[in-house]
Protein backbone atom coordinates (compact mmCIF):
# COMPACT_ATOMS: atom_id res chain seq x y z
CA UNK A 1 0.00 0.00 0.00
CA UNK A 2 1.38 3.39 -0.99
CA UNK A 3 -0.03 6.50 0.70
CA UNK A 4 0.17 9.67 -1.38
CA UNK A 5 -1.33 13.13 -1.10
CA UNK A 6 -0.77 16.77 -0.40
CA UNK A 7 1.39 18.08 2.42
CA UNK A 8 -0.64 18.40 5.58
CA UNK A 9 -3.27 15.85 4.54
CA UNK A 10 -2.43 13.55 7.45
CA UNK A 11 -0.17 10.90 5.91
CA UNK A 12 2.51 10.97 8.58
CA UNK A 13 -0.13 11.38 11.28
CA UNK A 14 -1.74 8.15 10.08
CA UNK A 15 1.57 6.30 10.37
CA UNK A 16 2.17 7.71 13.86
CA UNK A 17 -1.28 6.49 14.82
CA UNK A 18 -0.47 3.00 13.53
CA UNK A 19 2.73 3.05 15.58
CA UNK A 20 0.91 4.15 18.73
CA UNK A 21 2.88 7.39 18.90
CA UNK A 22 -0.36 9.38 18.99
CA UNK A 23 -3.86 8.44 20.18
CA UNK A 24 -6.74 8.57 17.68
CA UNK A 25 -9.31 11.28 18.40
CA UNK A 26 -12.02 8.77 17.51
CA UNK A 27 -12.07 5.03 16.96
CA UNK A 28 -9.16 2.67 17.53
CA UNK A 29 -6.30 0.95 15.73
CA UNK A 30 -6.60 -2.82 15.30
CA UNK A 31 -3.82 -5.11 14.11
CA UNK A 32 -4.61 -8.39 12.37
CA UNK A 33 -2.96 -11.82 12.57
CA UNK A 34 -1.90 -11.32 16.18
CA UNK A 35 0.50 -8.52 15.26
CA UNK A 36 1.75 -6.41 18.15
CA UNK A 37 2.66 -2.76 17.87
CA UNK A 38 6.23 -3.55 18.93
CA UNK A 39 6.52 -5.97 16.00
CA UNK A 40 6.13 -3.29 13.31
CA UNK A 41 9.25 -2.38 11.36
CA UNK A 42 9.43 1.40 10.98
CA UNK A 43 11.65 3.47 8.70
CA UNK A 44 11.21 7.17 9.57
CA UNK A 45 11.77 10.15 7.35
CA UNK A 46 15.44 10.98 6.95
CA UNK A 47 14.83 14.37 8.55
CA UNK A 48 13.60 12.53 11.67
CA UNK A 49 16.76 10.44 11.96
CA UNK A 50 19.66 11.62 14.09
CA UNK A 51 22.71 11.38 11.84
CA UNK A 52 25.39 12.64 14.19
CA UNK A 53 25.45 9.96 16.88
CA UNK A 54 28.64 7.86 17.05
CA UNK A 55 27.08 4.42 16.53
CA UNK A 56 28.32 1.71 14.22
CA UNK A 57 26.17 0.20 11.49
CA UNK A 58 25.96 -2.98 13.57
CA UNK A 59 24.67 -1.06 16.60
CA UNK A 60 22.06 0.74 14.52
CA UNK A 61 20.81 -2.46 12.90
CA UNK A 62 20.68 -4.51 16.11
CA UNK A 63 18.73 -1.75 17.86
CA UNK A 64 15.79 -3.01 15.82
CA UNK A 65 15.85 -6.21 17.87
CA UNK A 66 15.35 -4.42 21.19
CA UNK A 67 11.58 -4.70 21.00
CA UNK A 68 11.97 -8.47 21.41
CA UNK A 69 13.99 -8.26 24.62
CA UNK A 70 16.63 -6.23 26.49
CA UNK A 71 19.54 -8.47 25.48
CA UNK A 72 20.76 -9.66 22.11
CA UNK A 73 20.32 -13.40 21.78
CA UNK A 74 22.14 -15.61 19.32
CA UNK A 75 18.98 -15.68 17.21
CA UNK A 76 18.75 -11.89 17.19
CA UNK A 77 22.37 -11.59 16.11
CA UNK A 78 21.75 -14.09 13.33
CA UNK A 79 18.69 -12.14 12.19
CA UNK A 80 20.68 -8.90 12.15
CA UNK A 81 23.46 -10.52 10.12
CA UNK A 82 20.98 -11.93 7.62
CA UNK A 83 19.22 -8.59 7.19
CA UNK A 84 22.51 -6.75 6.73
CA UNK A 85 23.48 -9.26 4.05
CA UNK A 86 20.07 -8.80 2.42
CA UNK A 87 20.60 -5.03 2.36
CA UNK A 88 24.17 -5.49 1.03
CA UNK A 89 25.79 -3.73 3.99
CA UNK A 90 27.42 -6.68 5.77
CA UNK A 91 30.87 -5.48 4.74
CA UNK A 92 30.42 -2.09 6.45
CA UNK A 93 29.02 -3.31 9.78
CA UNK A 94 31.83 -1.70 11.79
CA UNK A 95 31.72 1.67 10.05
CA UNK A 96 30.25 4.74 11.72
CA UNK A 97 26.63 5.30 10.70
CA UNK A 98 27.19 9.04 10.44
CA UNK A 99 29.95 8.48 7.84
CA UNK A 100 27.72 6.58 5.43
CA UNK A 101 26.16 7.92 2.26
CA UNK A 102 22.43 8.63 2.27
CA UNK A 103 21.67 5.40 0.44
CA UNK A 104 23.80 3.33 2.83
CA UNK A 105 22.10 4.93 5.82
CA UNK A 106 18.68 4.06 4.43
CA UNK A 107 19.77 0.46 3.85
CA UNK A 108 21.03 0.27 7.43
CA UNK A 109 17.77 1.69 8.76
CA UNK A 110 15.77 -0.69 6.58
CA UNK A 111 17.81 -3.60 7.97
CA UNK A 112 16.99 -2.30 11.46
CA UNK A 113 13.29 -2.19 10.59
CA UNK A 114 13.48 -5.77 9.28
CA UNK A 115 14.95 -6.87 12.61
CA UNK A 116 11.82 -5.57 14.31
CA UNK A 117 9.25 -7.36 12.17
CA UNK A 118 8.36 -10.51 10.31
CA UNK A 119 5.23 -9.15 8.67
CA UNK A 120 4.71 -5.35 8.45
CA UNK A 121 6.96 -2.47 7.34
CA UNK A 122 5.94 1.17 7.67
CA UNK A 123 8.11 3.42 5.51
CA UNK A 124 7.82 7.21 5.74
CA UNK A 125 9.32 8.83 2.62
CA UNK A 126 12.12 6.21 2.37
CA UNK A 127 13.82 7.78 -0.68
CA UNK A 128 13.53 11.47 0.22
CA UNK A 129 16.73 13.32 -0.64
CA UNK A 130 18.36 10.41 -2.47
CA UNK A 131 19.69 10.61 -6.02
CA UNK A 132 17.73 8.90 -8.85
CA UNK A 133 19.99 5.83 -9.08
CA UNK A 134 19.88 5.14 -5.33
CA UNK A 135 16.15 5.86 -5.31
CA UNK A 136 15.50 3.23 -7.97
CA UNK A 137 17.71 0.70 -6.16
CA UNK A 138 15.88 1.24 -2.88
CA UNK A 139 12.46 0.90 -4.52
CA UNK A 140 13.59 -2.40 -6.04
CA UNK A 141 14.74 -3.62 -2.62
CA UNK A 142 11.39 -2.71 -1.08
CA UNK A 143 9.53 -4.45 -3.92
CA UNK A 144 11.68 -7.55 -3.38
CA UNK A 145 10.81 -7.62 0.34
CA UNK A 146 7.11 -7.62 -0.53
CA UNK A 147 7.40 -10.08 -3.41
CA UNK A 148 9.91 -12.60 -2.09
CA UNK A 149 9.54 -12.37 1.69
CA UNK A 150 5.81 -11.74 1.81
CA UNK A 151 6.08 -8.59 3.92
CA UNK A 152 3.19 -6.16 3.97
CA UNK A 153 4.60 -2.74 3.11
CA UNK A 154 2.85 0.54 3.89
CA UNK A 155 4.82 3.41 2.36
CA UNK A 156 4.28 7.16 2.37
CA UNK A 157 5.58 8.81 -0.78
CA UNK A 158 5.30 12.01 -2.78
CA UNK A 159 6.42 10.06 -5.86
CA UNK A 160 3.12 9.23 -7.56
CA UNK A 161 4.88 7.63 -10.54
CA UNK A 162 6.67 5.20 -8.20
CA UNK A 163 3.40 4.45 -6.44
CA UNK A 164 1.79 3.55 -9.76
CA UNK A 165 4.77 1.39 -10.70
CA UNK A 166 5.33 -0.55 -7.47
CA UNK A 167 2.18 -0.49 -5.32
CA UNK A 168 -0.65 -3.02 -5.29
CA UNK A 169 -2.98 -0.46 -3.70
CA UNK A 170 -2.88 3.32 -3.45
CA UNK A 171 -4.40 5.44 -0.70
CA UNK A 172 -4.62 9.11 -1.69
CA UNK A 173 -5.31 11.42 1.24
CA UNK A 174 -6.50 14.93 0.46
CA UNK A 175 -8.46 17.66 2.16
CA UNK A 176 -12.10 16.72 1.67
CA UNK A 177 -11.47 13.67 -0.55
CA UNK A 178 -9.77 10.29 -0.40
CA UNK A 179 -9.17 7.38 -2.76
CA UNK A 180 -8.33 3.75 -2.03
CA UNK A 181 -7.90 1.26 -4.84
CA UNK A 182 -5.65 -0.25 -7.47
CA UNK A 183 -3.16 1.78 -9.51
CA UNK A 184 -5.31 1.33 -12.63
CA UNK A 185 -8.40 2.62 -10.82
CA UNK A 186 -6.39 5.50 -9.38
CA UNK A 187 -5.33 6.64 -12.84
CA UNK A 188 -9.01 6.99 -13.79
CA UNK A 189 -10.12 8.68 -10.57
CA UNK A 190 -10.47 12.47 -10.23
CA UNK A 191 -7.57 12.56 -7.77
CA UNK A 192 -5.46 10.33 -9.97
CA UNK A 193 -6.13 12.37 -13.09
CA UNK A 194 -5.19 15.50 -11.16
CA UNK A 195 -1.98 14.16 -9.61
CA UNK A 196 -0.86 11.45 -12.03
CA UNK A 197 -2.12 12.70 -15.38
CA UNK A 198 -4.61 9.87 -15.79
CA UNK A 199 -6.89 9.69 -18.80
CA UNK A 200 -10.65 9.30 -18.67
CA UNK A 201 -12.43 6.63 -20.67
CA UNK A 202 -15.33 7.22 -23.03
Protein language model annotation of sequence segments:
Residues 19:
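Helix-to-loop junction immediately C-terminal to a conserved catalytic motif
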Residues 75-92:
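Conserved ABC ATPase "signature" region
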Residues 121-124:
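Catalytic Walker B motif of ABC-type/P-loop ATPase nucleotide-binding domains
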Residues 170-183:
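H-loop (His-switch) and adjacent beta-strand-loop-beta switch element
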Residues 24-38:
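Conserved ABC transporter NBD signature motif
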Residues 96-100, 104:
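Conserved ABC ATPase signature
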Residues 157-158:
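H-loop/switch region of ABC-family ATPase nucleotide-binding domains
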Amino acid sequence: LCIVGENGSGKSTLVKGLLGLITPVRGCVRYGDGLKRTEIGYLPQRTDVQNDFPASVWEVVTSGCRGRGPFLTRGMRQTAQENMALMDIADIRDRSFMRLSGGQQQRALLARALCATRSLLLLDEPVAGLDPVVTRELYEVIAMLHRDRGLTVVMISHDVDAALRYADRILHMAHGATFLGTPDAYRLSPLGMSFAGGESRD
